[in-house]
Amino acid sequence: MPVIAPSILSADFANLERDIHNIEANGADWVHVDVMDGIFVPNISIGIPVVKALRPVTSLPLDVHLIIDRPIRYAEEFIKAGADWLTIHLESDQPQNTLACLDKIRAMGCKAAISLKPKTPAEAAIPYLAKCDMVLVMTVEPGFGAQKFMADMMPKVKKIRQMLDEVNPACIIEVDGGVDAVTYRTCRENGAEALVTGSAYFKAADRAAFVKTLRA
C-alpha cells in the first residue's frame, strides 16, 4: 500500500494548522514540506521556524524536502525542528558533501533521501543509493506547485527501482509533481511507493475519497 503525502505547498498558509489536521482526518500518511531558498530554485517557501511550529501540530511524519543550495549547512537544524524524513537534491552540492550530509541525517536518527530533477539521469543516483532510505524522483521541475506531470520520468523510476533492488532493497521511491487521480497509477506501476500530491489533493471535492483512490 503506497504512502500518501499531501504537500503543504498547495495548502492555505493562513490556515496551515487547519489544513494539516485535514490531512490527518482524510487518512493521508505523511505531511510533505517543500523548503525552497530562491537560489537552488527561483521560488522561496518556508524554513526551519515553520517546520518547528508544525511538529506539535501533527503526529504524522514530516517529509521535509530541502530544495536548497548546499543542504548540509541546515540539515541538523531541520532534524532538530522535527523532520522525520529529510530529502536533499544530489544536484545541490559536491558529491562528497552530499554523501556527508546523508551520513549526518542518518546519524541523527532521521530518514535520509536524495532527489533527482527531471533532467538528472537515474545513473547519477548510484553513488548515494546505499546510504538512502528513499529516492525522490521529481515528475515536474521543482520550485512551483500545480505543474503538469512528466510521464517520461517513469522509465527513470523503473530504472532506479531496479538499481535499488540490487544494492538497497529496503529503500523506497517517492514521486513528486503532478500526481493526481489519473497519473498515480503509472507511478505505482513503475515502482513508486510514496506519492506526493499537492494541488490535486487540496482541490479535490472529497479529499478522503481522493486519498483512497491513490491507494486503490
Please state what every model-predicted region is.
Residues M1-T87, S92-A100, K104, K111-A112, ...:
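Conserved N-terminal beta1-alpha1 strand-loop-helix module at the mouth
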Residues H32, E174-V175:
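Generic enzyme active-site microenvironment
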Residues T58, M108, V167-P169:
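Helix C-cap/helix->beta junction micro-motif
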Residues I88, V175, T197-G198:
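Thr-Gly-centered strand-to-loop micro-motif
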Residues S115-K119:
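Short gly/ser/thr-rich secondary-structure transition/capping motifs
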Residues V140-P142:
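Short glycine-rich anion-binding loops that position phosphate/pyrophosphate groups of nucleotides
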Residues G178-N190:
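Acidic, divalent-metal-coordinating active-site segment for phosphoryl/phosphodiester hydrolysis
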Residues N190-T197, F202-K203:
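Acidic, Mg2+-coordinating phosphoryl-transfer loop and its flanking beta/alpha structural elements
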